[in-house]
């Protein structure tokens, strides 16, 4: 009888003789637990250094939702900050949308992270910022367009929270899977402005608060494995109001594509990095919202329009898009968003916002003609 083979040795290249127990999704390397963790951390450190994401002395807000991405992001940022002496002042920033049975539970996980990591935590709520909770909004308008409201409000809330604590940069838990899905969604929507920049590791440089994505090249499966290997506690439940979010369809497509072509995720990201837009595509001029002071290309920002609609009962205000002119233009709130609510990893990328606003086939084809790959 043939003897059963044990696991292969660790392939870290560091001389480790431990048996390999983890296959890294990103490159297929077979590693032991400790070497996998170190390899994962080295990948993030390389992305930070190569892209010069931070400067010594910066106060960095970490978007924290309590989910796996933001939990791993906070842990790795603290680990690398200590190990490599980045000299960063790290602080956790959470947004309470007011969703009972979901956000209140996830914030308990964030509180545990605060205690364990020893990082300051600031929580801002939709109720305090906008006078509405998501439970209130869904009760008024139903679930059809609720992701649009949440996406706009959450992104602005993160910016306001970061400014409140004096942060010079906001980091979010977008991972490689998120980036590939967002790229695909923007192609399907024909969203030229976002398509050109949705895979950037730093966005928002044209405004006051840049956003960085240190986990950009980390696969979701590796993030889950890292959390388990390091026994990190995080919140598992998905948002109860977004069971049919647009991103879900893109995610399934990317997963199916990955089964056939394992490098599909990285290839999609690399393709996005090479996208450029023709000069004749008109981009908006950013200015300040007359009501709240947030960036917009209109007199009022999208958040203020949505709030006005809720307060006056005209809930289509700010939700329905007007007919496009022949010249392709993009509203500033669309330019600023990176693919939804920015909740991916507690700060970026759910992509549910605007699911019902996907472009008609003919308009999509016309817009894609303006792209250069």
From Swiss-Prot:
Record's Gene Ontology CC terms? cytosol; cytosolic tRNA wobble base thiouridylase complex
What do mutants without this gene show? Required for normal germline maturation and for viability. Viable at 20 degrees Celsius. At a higher temperature (25 degrees Celsius), the hatched eggs progress through the L1-L4 larval stages with kinetics similar to those of wild type but present an important delay in germline maturation. Whereas gravid wild-type worms are present 53 hours after hatching, germline maturation are still ongoing in the mutant after 66 hours, and the first adults containing eggs are observed 75 hours after hatching, when a large number of new L1 are already present in the wild type.
Question: Which top EC class is given?
Answer: transferase
Cited Pfam families: ATP_bind_3, zn-ribbon_14
Location in the cell: Cytoplasm
- Which keywords accompany this UniProt record? Cytoplasm, RNA-binding, Transferase, tRNA processing, tRNA-binding
Whether Transferase counts among this entry's keywords is yes
Associated pathway: tRNA modification; 5-methoxycarbonylmethyl-2-thiouridine-tRNA biosynthesis
Entry's Gene3D superfamilies?
HUPs
The record's Gene Ontology biological-process terms are:
embryonic morphogenesis; oocyte development; protein urmylation; spermatogenesis; translation; tRNA thio-modification; tRNA wobble position uridine thiolation; tRNA wobble uridine modification
Molecular function via GO: nucleotidyltransferase activity; sulfurtransferase activity; tRNA binding
Q: Which residues form the signal peptide?
A: none
Matches recorded under PANTHER family: ATPASES OF THE PP SUPERFAMILY-RELATED (PTHR11807), CYTOPLASMIC TRNA 2-THIOLATION PROTEIN 1 (PTHR11807:SF12)
User: Cross-referenced NCBIfam families, in alphabetical order?
Assistant: TIGR00269 family protein (TIGR00269)
Q: Which family does it belong to?
A: Belongs to the TtcA family. CTU1/NCS6/ATPBD3 subfamily.
Q: What is this protein called?
A: Cytoplasmic tRNA 2-thiolation protein 1
Organism of provenance = Caenorhabditis elegans
């Amino acid at each position: 009888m043939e003897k059963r083979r044990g696991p292969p040795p660790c392939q870290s290249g560091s001389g480790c003789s431990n048996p390999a127990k983890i296959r890294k999704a990103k490159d297929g390397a077979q590693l032991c637990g400790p070497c996998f963790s170190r390899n994962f951390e080295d990948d993030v450190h390389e992305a930070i250094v190569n892209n010069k994401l931070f400067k010594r002395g910066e106060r960095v807000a970490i978007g924290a939702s309590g989910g796996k991405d933001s939990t791993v992001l906070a842990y790795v940022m603290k680990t690398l900050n200590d190990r490599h002496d980045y000299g960063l002042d790290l602080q956790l920033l959470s947004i309470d949308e007011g969703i009972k049975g979901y956000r209140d539970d996830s914030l308990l996980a964030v509180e545990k992270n605060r205690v364990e990591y020893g990082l300051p935590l600031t929580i801002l709520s939709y109720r305090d910022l906008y006078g509405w909770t998501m439970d209130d909004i869904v009760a008024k308008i139903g679930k059809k367009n609720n992701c649009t409201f949440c996406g706009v409000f959450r992104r602005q809330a993160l910016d306001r929270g970061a400014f409140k604590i004096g942060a010079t940069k906001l980091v979010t838990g977008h991972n490689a899977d998120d980036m590939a899905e967002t790229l695909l969604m923007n192609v399907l929507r024909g969203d030229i402005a976002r398509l050109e920049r949705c895979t950037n590791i730093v966005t928002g440089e044209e405004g006051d608060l840049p956003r960085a994505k240190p986990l950009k090249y980390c696969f979701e499966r590796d993030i889950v494995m890292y959390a388990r290997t390091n026994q990190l506690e995080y919140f598992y439940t998905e948002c109860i109001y977004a069971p049919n979010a647009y991103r879900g369809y893109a995610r399934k497509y990317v997963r199916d594509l990955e089964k056939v072509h394992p490098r599909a995720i990285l290839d999609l990201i690399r393709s996005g990095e090479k996208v450029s837009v023709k000069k004749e595509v008109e981009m908006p001029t950013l200015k300040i919202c007359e009501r709240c002071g947030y960036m917009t290309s209109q007199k009022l920002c999208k958040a203020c329009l949505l709030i006005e609609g809720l307060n006056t009962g005209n809930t289509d205000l700010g939700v329905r898009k007007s007919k496009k002119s022949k010249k392709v233009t993009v509203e500033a709130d669309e330019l600023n968003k990176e693919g939804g609510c920015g909740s991916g990893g507690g700060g970026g990328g759910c992509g549910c916002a605007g699911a019902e606003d996907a472009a008609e086939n003919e308009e999509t084809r016309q817009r894609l003609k303006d792209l250069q790959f």
